[in-house]
Amino acid sequence: MADNRDPASDQMKHWKEQRAAQKPDILTTGSGNPIGDKLNILTAGPRGPLLVQDVVFTDEMAHFDRERIPERVVHAKGAGAFGYFEVTHDITRFSKAKVFEHVGKRTPIAVRFSTVAGESGSADTVRDPRGFAVKFYTEDGNWDLVGNNTPIFFIRDAILFPSFIHSQKRNPQTHLKDPDMVWDFWSLRPESLHQVSFLFSDRGIPDGHRHMNGYGSHTFKLVNEKGEAVYCKFHYKTDQGIKNLSVEDAARLPQEDPDYGIRDLFNAIATGNYPSWTFYIQVMTFQEAEAFPFNPFDLTKVWPHSEYPLIPVGKLVLNRNPVNYFAEVEQMAFDPSNMPPGIEPSPDKMLQGRLFGYPDTHRHRLGANYLQIPVNCPFRARVANYQRDGPMCFQDNQGGAPNYYPNSFSAPEQTHSALEHCTRYSGDVQRFNSANEDNVTQVRTFYLNVLNEEERKRLCENIAGHLKDAQLFIQKKAVKNFSDVHPDYGARIQALLDKYNAEXPENAVHTYVQAGSHLAAREKANL
């Protein structure tokens, strides 16, 4: 209703009210030249052709033609906000990172929430993992904690990531989401069982972005002032309480408000209802890692809280909406390799792959100088290096300072305090197959002990409701994997699939032939 609008709907009204005492700015071209007429093109006579000297038109049109930048290959649809991280508990015994320097310290942060597989115009309420990335602007440079709303992931080896994402995206011929592709990949990679079970549980469709937890997911390394190191995992638990959408509400909202999550976050912050999350770590010593019953760097598994309890660290608070979405959210770029001294990577194979993949895609999407974009700029540190030039270099390019190292002219020098922790590794160099590294034990615990009976029922209904659209041989492979977790898990899904399959005509397998095939016309007619 026009008389009962939320802050997001009234953004234009509020912008005008904030400038009520000001005169409108004079309209200009991109180069700052005043414009006398923005409504009528320059032509030779009222019915004549336009003139190429109409720079008002060409300036506007040329910029319009270049407004769009490449969409993120994953996490394209997102919401962003800004705030601070405040330390509430001392963990300097574990890490020398300045972000944890003392209780009460506040560090500015930027956060981006997102879905994974959908395009930038897709709905916020799909069943999909949610990205939950946090950028800490520290005095030692930016720290990007590029997490999700799940503590686990579908795969444990980074070489599978492109194929996994392709399977979740659109079919290369039909350009449709394809259940065959989705479930074929999942069924062939049973390490996905844990994340698939989480995804199809009630938490698979969070109620907006404020009511879900966040996780760094990977295993990281913390290093203290003495050079002592431990492994750790990061958790951020919502202070608003966990809330999820029902399947029915999630199906209704894309028609009514496909941007439900963005709107909810914007309105909460605009009305002073600032969302917050409590930040925790789990810690594991190197000795404990050696004796751990499974690979502690396996992204498809969690560390049991009973053995590695959550240690409180601080609070994440979001108290500012973006001033401009494109400038501060679309151009925001997170890079897991942005780690200040005191925080380092572990041998987690997925993390190792992301250390390269993320900055590489940012350079493609935003350009070689993407770290000069204000939202990505480490504004609390002084950038001093030997990198120069490149497209869209809009700072001073470090003036006349030497652009080579080493040099004899008092240019930036390395600092011993930033040296990485010394870690010893040994073993044969080869491609190790991790496909069969106990893919079911933790999933069984999740199914039997974490979920109650009603949640198990909904989980199986959600899985069957999606799996029913895949071919029968793929259904069979998937059900076997669920049965390996627990016979009841597979049996429930199979019973539901039997009902679906009895109602629908028998699955047909279609064969597609490339143009120029040497098949005889008669053979083609039988396809």
Curated annotation (Swiss-Prot):
- The EC class name is oxidoreductase
Q: Where is this region: Disordered?
A: 1-32
Record's keyword terms, sorted: Acetylation, Heme, Hydrogen peroxide, Iron, Metal-binding, Mitogen, NADP, Oxidoreductase, Peroxidase, Peroxisome, Phosphoprotein
Q: Which GO terms describe its biological process?
A: hydrogen peroxide catabolic process; positive regulation of cell division; response to hydrogen peroxide
EC assignment: the record states 1.11.1.6
Judging by the UniProt lineage, the source's domain of life is Eukaryota
Localisation per UniProt entry: Peroxisome matrix
Q: Which InterPro entries match?
A: Catalase, Catalase_3, Catalase_AS, Catalase_clade1/3, Catalase_core, Catalase_haem_BS, Catalase_immune_responsive, Catalase_sf
Q: Does the keyword ATP-binding apply?
A: no
Q: Write down the required cofactor(s).
A: heme; NADP(+)
Q: GO terms for CC? A: cytoplasm; mitochondrion; peroxisomal matrix; peroxisome
Which cysteines share a disulfide bond? Answer: none
UniProt-listed PANTHER family: CATALASE (PTHR11465:SF9)
Annotated protein name in UniProt? Catalase
- Organism, by scientific name, is Sus scrofa
Q: Taxonomically, what lineage is the organism?
A: Eukaryota, Metazoa, Chordata, Craniata, Vertebrata
Q: What gene is this protein translated from? A: CAT
